[in-house]
Amino acid sequence: MEQDKYLTVAAITKYIEKKFEVDPYMKQVFVRGEISNLKQPASGHLYFTVKDEFAMLRSVMFHKAVQKIGFVPEDGMNVLITGRIGVFTKAGRYQFYAEHMEPDGVGALYIQLEQLKSQLEKEGLFAETHKKVLPSFPSKVAVVTSKTGAAVRDILTTIHRRMPSVEVIVYPTIVQGEKAAQKIVENIGKINQRNDIDVMIIGRGGGSLEELWAFNEEPVVRAVYDSDVPVISAVGHETDFALSDFSADVRAATPTAAAELAVPDYRDLEERLAERKYRLLAVTRQALERKERSLEQLKQHLILNGPKHQLEQQMERTDYFSERLNNAFSKQIFVKQTVFDRLNDRLHYYHPNKEIELQKEQMALRLQALEKAMKQLLKDKQQSFFRQIDALEHLSPLSLLKRGFGVTYKENMLVKSVQELEVGDNIQVKMQGGQIEALITAKEEDISGN
C-alpha cells in the first residue's frame, strides 16, 4: 500500500539514533568550544551549549561525570570536552553527551586551585583570627616531609645549629602523587594525637604546580586548619604558594626559613639574657639606692622627732626651770635674810628681847613654810615632767615597735587605713629590729568602719 512507505516520527528518530551509535566517528568525539546557557538542576546533571563563532552544539553531562571534573564550569569558559554524539528522542534532536571536561588555555589545575581557594576563603579557613601564635621556646618539633631530599636536611641542620637542645621528630611522607595528600593528612593526625609536640613544619622543596599539588588538596588544607598544634607551612621556594600556606598558622618561604621560625637562636637568647641581666642589676641597684635614701630620711626623722630628742628637750627645759626656781628661792631667802638682819639691827637698837624671840620664831616658821612650799612646788613640777616623758615614750613609734606593733608604708608613704591598700600592692612593714616587704594577697575591711 502507498501508506507503507511512510515512517513514524519515532521510527525515523530511532533510525537516526542507530546511525549515530554505529558510526565510529560519533562514539568518541573531541570538542573545543565555549560554554553558554549553563544550567544545573537538583539532579546534579549539567545542561549547556558548546559554541564557536560558526555553530553551537547542545550538550549534557550526567552527575556521575560531573563529580570527576575537579572544577566548576561557568558560562563563557573555553573547554575541551570528550564524549559521544547521540539523539535525544523525545526532543527529536541530536546532542553531545559529555564524559570528560577540562579548561582550554589555562590548565585545569589552575582553575581548580582558584575555585577551591575562593570556596575555602569564604568558609574562613584563611582568617587571621584563627591563626595560633608559635611557641617562643619549643622543646619538640615535628616535621612532615619526604625523608630524603634537601628540605628535611635543611630543616634538621638549621634547627640543630640554632637550638641543639630541641628534639626534632620527622614523620616521613610522600609529598607528590595520588596518595600524597592522604599520607600528609594521616601524619598531621598522628602528631595531634600526641601531647608533647610544640610546633610542626609541613612542606617540601620547590617544584611545578603538579608536583606541589598535594598541598593544594582540600583534605590537607582542612587538616592544617583543624590542627591543634601550630603549623608552619613551607612548600616550595619564595615564589611558590600552596593553599596549605594560607590555612597554616605561619607561612615560610623555604624549609630553612620554617626552621628559623620554629626555634630561636640560642646565641640571640644569650645576648637577650645578658642584656636583661644588666637591666635587672641596674634596676635593683637603683631600688636599693632609693631604699637607702628613704631609710636615711627615716633615721633623720626619728632623730628629730623621736623620744630621745624629746627627752633631751624636756631635760633642758627642766634644767632651765630648776635654775629659775633655785634663783627665785635664793632671792626670797636673800630678801628675808635682809629683812631679818634689819629687824635684828633694830632689836639690838631697842633691845626688845621678848619681841625679838617672838619674831625669830615667826621668821623661822615662815622660812620653814616657804622652804616646804618651794620643795613641794619643785616636786610637783618634776612629777609633771616625768608624766609627760612617760606619755611621749608611750606614743613613740619605737615604743609601739617594742610592744610587737609594726608601721606600714606603701611607696615610702605611711599607711593609715586598710582602704589605702589593694590586693597586689607591695608594702614595707617597719618592725622591732628591722623591716620586711610583703605582697597583699587578700583584703578584708572592718564592716564596723573602725
Swiss-Prot record:
Molecular function in Gene Ontology: exodeoxyribonuclease VII activity; nucleic acid binding
Catalysed reactions, as listed in the record: Exonucleolytic cleavage in either 5'- to 3'- or 3'- to 5'-direction to yield nucleoside 5'-phosphates
Cellular-component GO terms for this entry: cytoplasm; exodeoxyribonuclease VII complex
Domain of life of the native organism: Bacteria
Keywords attached to this entry: Cytoplasm, Exonuclease, Hydrolase, Nuclease
EC number: 3.1.11.6
Enzyme class: hydrolase
GO biological process: DNA catabolic process
Localisation: Cytoplasm
Pfam families, A to Z: Exonuc_VII_L (PF02601), tRNA_anti_2 (PF13742)
Iron is among the record's keywords: no
Keyword Cytoplasm: yes
NCBIfam families on file: xseA
Purpose of the protein: Bidirectionally degrades single-stranded DNA into large acid-insoluble oligonucleotides, which are then degraded further into small acid-soluble oligonucleotides.
Family membership noted in the UniProt record: Belongs to the XseA family.
Quaternary context: Heterooligomer composed of large and small subunits.
Name this protein carries in UniProt: Exodeoxyribonuclease 7 large subunit
